[in-house]
């Protein structure tokens, strides 16, 4: 059978199921694919195939995740489901799966539990814009008041973590009922997908953001000038445009792009995702180096202080064997750059144990081009000991 071409006609959205252990996240994921498969919009995936999640490595951290994809009438979704709570924490903090929105599953029989709260908090900290609630196991609750109570608790919890608790769609259903083909519960899965289509916003495309390219390598071509190579992170750069070089003391030096090359071919422009070489006018080879970024003038600022949400690897994951304390100074690997920084722990936190997820303040030894949402690894002696993302810039 010929390989299917990736259909670009529908907008693409990344979502996932989050929530407390045994509330039915994986059953719901299987139910979504089963119900949509009947409408020809998905490939059927069994509970077991999703539950036996393969290991993946992202920024040196091993995470178990299952990826499924499906379509609705309006969108193409890539959906992530993780078997264990620790996998969720790692997944959301390291960005192995960037979520544009999430379905939070809560069992009507239990109501919100500690991990329900923890996942909502994590979603807030890593800037997941909106959540949709699926109240599961409603076929096991006869009391309407009990359902209303759980719904009220969920709305309060969402509002507490600065989501729109009043307007967030809450769908009452039964994932197992839908998986077993009960029409009443299949309809609820379709209702859930409609809620995702309308409530979860389309993510801004990388190509529509300002141009930015981290420099990976630099070389000079005799008679033509200096070429900087790298993968364009966001935006578009055209031949003849003015750009700025930032970071590592480049002090915002400006230049003009006189050529864009990809695979030894000349292009008129490079766009997000392309690996290119940019020919820069009037820039000496020693004025630009790996770790700097090239961008449109005035679009990116340098910062040396920020707050971040981080996950610290366990010993079994190749991380530290011992905790670290306040003022710990590891290297931060940001884009293509290793830079030393000092960690300040939250008030009242004496130390951080391997396996912890914590909010820290970081002060780098020199400013680096960075923005909220940017992900990084924490390294010590060349090995990854943690990963995280910037949640707030300070200077």
Swiss-Prot record:
Region (G5) residue spans: 174-176
Gene Ontology cellular component annotations, sorted alphabetically: cytosol
Molecular functions per Gene Ontology: GTP binding; GTPase activity; translation elongation factor activity
Keyword Ion transport: no
Domain tr-type G: 10-205
Listed PROSITE patterns: G_TR_1 (PS00301), G_TR_2 (PS51722)
Keywords: Cytoplasm, Elongation factor, GTP-binding, Hydrolase, Magnesium, Metal-binding, Nucleotide-binding, Protein biosynthesis
Highest taxon of source: Bacteria
Region (G1): 19-26
Chief location bin: cytoplasm
Uppermost EC category: hydrolase
Keyword Magnesium listed: yes
Recorded catalytic activity of this chain's protein: GTP + H2O = GDP + phosphate + H(+)
The family this protein is said to belong to: Belongs to the TRAFAC class translation factor GTPase superfamily. Classic translation factor GTPase family. EF-Tu/EF-1A subfamily.
Reported function: GTP hydrolase that promotes the GTP-dependent binding of aminoacyl-tRNA to the A-site of ribosomes during protein biosynthesis.
Protein name, UniProt field: Elongation factor Tu
Organismal lineage: Bacteria, Pseudomonadati, Bacteroidota, Bacteroidia, Bacteroidales
The encoding gene: tuf
């Amino acid at each position: 059978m010929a390989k299917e071409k990736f259909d670009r006609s529908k907008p693409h959205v990344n979502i996932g199921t989050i929530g407390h252990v045994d509330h039915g996240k994986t059953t719901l994921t299987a139910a979504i694919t089963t119900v949509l498969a009947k409408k020809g919009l998905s490939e059927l995936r069994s509970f077991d195939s999703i539950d036996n999640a393969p290991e993946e490595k992202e920024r040196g951290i091993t995470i178990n995740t299952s990826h499924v994809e499906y379509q609705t009438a309006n969108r193409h979704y890539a959906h992530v489901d993780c078997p264990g709570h620790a996998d969720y924490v790692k997944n959301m903090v390291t960005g192995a799966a960037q979520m544009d929105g999430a379905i939070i599953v809560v069992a009507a029989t239990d109501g919100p539990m500690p991990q329900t709260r923890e996942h909502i908090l994590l979603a807030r900290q890593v800037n997941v814009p909106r959540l949709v609630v699926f109240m599961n196991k409603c076929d096991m609750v006869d009391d309407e008041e009990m359902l209303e109570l759980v719904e009220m608790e969920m709305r309060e919890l969402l509002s507490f973590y600065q989501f729109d608790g009043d307007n967030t769609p809450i769908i009452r259903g039964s994932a197992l009922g839908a998986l077993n083909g009960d029409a009443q519960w299949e309809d609820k899965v379709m209702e859930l997908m409609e809620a995702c289509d309308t409530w979860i916003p389309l993510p801004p495309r990388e190509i529509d953001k300002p141009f930015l390219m981290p420099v990976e390598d630099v070389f000079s071509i005799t008679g033509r000038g200096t070429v900087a190579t790298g993968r364009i992170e966001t935006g578009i750069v055209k031949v003849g445009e003015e750009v700025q070089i930032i970071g590592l003391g480049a002090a915002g030096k400006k230049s003009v792009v006189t050529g864009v090359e990809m695979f030894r071919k000349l292009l008129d422009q490079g766009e997000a995702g392309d690996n290119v070489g940019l020919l820069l006018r009037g820039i000496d080879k020693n004025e630009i180096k790996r770790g700097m970024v090239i961008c449109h003038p005035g679009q990116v600022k340098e910062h040396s202080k920020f707050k971040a949400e981080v996950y610290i690897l366990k010993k079994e994951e190749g991380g530290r064997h011992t905790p670290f304390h306040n003022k710990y100074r590891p290297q931060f690997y940001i884009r293509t750059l290793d830079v030393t920084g000092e960690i300040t722990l939250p008030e009242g936190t004496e130390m951080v144990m391997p396996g912890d997820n914590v909010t820290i303040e970081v002060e780098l030894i020199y400013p680096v081009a960075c923005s909220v949402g940017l992900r990084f690894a924490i390294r010590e002696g060349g090995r990854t000991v943690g990963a995280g993302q910037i949640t707030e810039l300070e200077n």
